[in-house]
């Protein structure tokens, strides 16, 4: 017998939360994935707009896309977590290490932003989402080490989930990276991922460094995953991601539970990055005290003044996770600020 891993209750609430968010922010499209952090099972996977063969107006070909596995997107700052993970795992930086986040140039390209100046530790770099800090961390890592760690996390690799039309994404390890490539990759430009790949990578952080095979079939036995990160690395990352939500992404908070995650906002590429269209991300883990689910929310091209991941994707994450944890019977944490 074949039993799907999809939990219809979580699937339904994810559909409703994503649909409401797409309408509220007048977005072109969106997707959400919920993974069981311990097994790699897909608990929910939803897309907007979604197809309905019974309604003529909802039969458009693009409505049948499973965006979570077919769409390859630059993840923006959500990738900074993986940059920090690589540096910690390979002993290049320690959690308490500081980095000069003052904007700097590579050739004619200025790397930096107005959020960061001076020496900051790794947690603060994630909280403030410092491009210059992430870039300098990345440039201290040898290319082969960076590629090897990211590949172990599933970046640039087919997840073999069983969903048709799955894209591989693009990491580009076959190239001889120039410094500008490695710098921009650190904050999620020049690399493309699917939502499912991003969820898989973060699941290693949630699962004490073990990467499991993604499955749409309900798993009967405990999976034998492969180690990508050490337990000490993931313990530090979980604390950092919780601090990100606590200090800079209040819309991602879930009442009664400790959660962690990272936003991402990336300009869409046409001929260049000069346009006004953006993709907004939030990738989160819950509960931080004993991780059980990893959730990725992507909102494509929201319209209006709100287009950052923390503004549009984070509240959708909060809505999905709030319901999912209760459906799964996961007890709330005590003394949690909401």
Language-model regions, residue ranges each:
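Small/polar-residue-rich segments within soluble enzyme cores
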Residues: 1, 296-297, 315-318
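Conserved, well-ordered alpha-helix/loop/beta-strand core segments that scaffold catalytic motifs
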Residues: 1-30
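A helicase ATPase "motif cassette" and its flanking acidic/Ser/Thr-rich regulatory loops
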Residues: 14, 125, 317
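Short, gly/Ser/Thr-rich active-site loops of penicillin-recognizing serine hydrolases
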Residues: 222-225, 314-338
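Short, charged, low-complexity patches
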Residues: 7, 11, 198, 309-321
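Short, intrinsically disordered, mixed-charge
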Residues: 19, 23, 242-246, 322, ...
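Beta-lactam-recognizing serine transpeptidase/beta-lactamase-like catalytic domain environment
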Residues: 6, 32-77, 82-303, 309, ...
């Amino acid at each position: 017998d074949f039993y799907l891993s999809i939990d219809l209750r979580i699937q339904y609430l994810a559909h409703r939360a994503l649909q409401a968010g797409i309408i509220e922010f007048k977005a072109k499209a969106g997707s959400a994935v919920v993974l069981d952090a311990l097994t790699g099972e897909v608990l929910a996977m939803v897309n907007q707009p979604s197809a309905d063969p019974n309604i003529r107006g909802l039969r458009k070909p693009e409505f049948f896309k499973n965006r979570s596995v077919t769409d390859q997107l630059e993840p923006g700052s959500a990738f900074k977590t993986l940059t920090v993970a690589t540096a910690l795992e390979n002993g290049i930086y320690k959690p308490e290490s500081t980095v000069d986040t003052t904007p700097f140039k590579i050739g004619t390209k200025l790397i930096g932003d107005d959020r960061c100046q001076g020496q900051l530790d790794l947690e603060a770099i994630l909280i403030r989402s410092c491009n210059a800090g992430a870039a300098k961390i990345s440039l201290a890592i040898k290319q082969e080490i960076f590629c090897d760690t990211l590949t172990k996390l599933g970046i640039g690799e087919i997840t073999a989930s069983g969903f048709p039309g799955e894209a591989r994404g693009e990491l580009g390890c076959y190239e001889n990276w120039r410094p500008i490539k490695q710098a921009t990759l650190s904050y999620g430009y020049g690399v493309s991922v699917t939502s499912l790949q991003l969820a898989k990578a973060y699941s290693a952080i949630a699962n004490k460094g073990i990467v499991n095979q993604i499955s749409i079939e309900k798993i009967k036995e405990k999976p034998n995953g492969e180690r990508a990160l050490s337990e000490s690395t993931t313990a530090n990352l979980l604390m950092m991601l919780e601090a990100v939500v606590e200090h800079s992404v209040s819309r991602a908070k879930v009442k009664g539970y400790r959660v962690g995650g990272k936003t991402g906002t990336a300009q869409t590429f046409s001929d260049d990055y000069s346009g006004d269209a953006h993709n907004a991300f939030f990738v989160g883990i819950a509960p931080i005290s004993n991780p059980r689910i990893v959730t990725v929310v992507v909102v494509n091209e929201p319209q209006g003044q709100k287009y950052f991941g923390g503004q549009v994707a984070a509240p959708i994450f909060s809505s999905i996770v709030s319901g999912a944890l209760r459906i799964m019977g996961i007890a709330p944490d005590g003394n949690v600020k909401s």
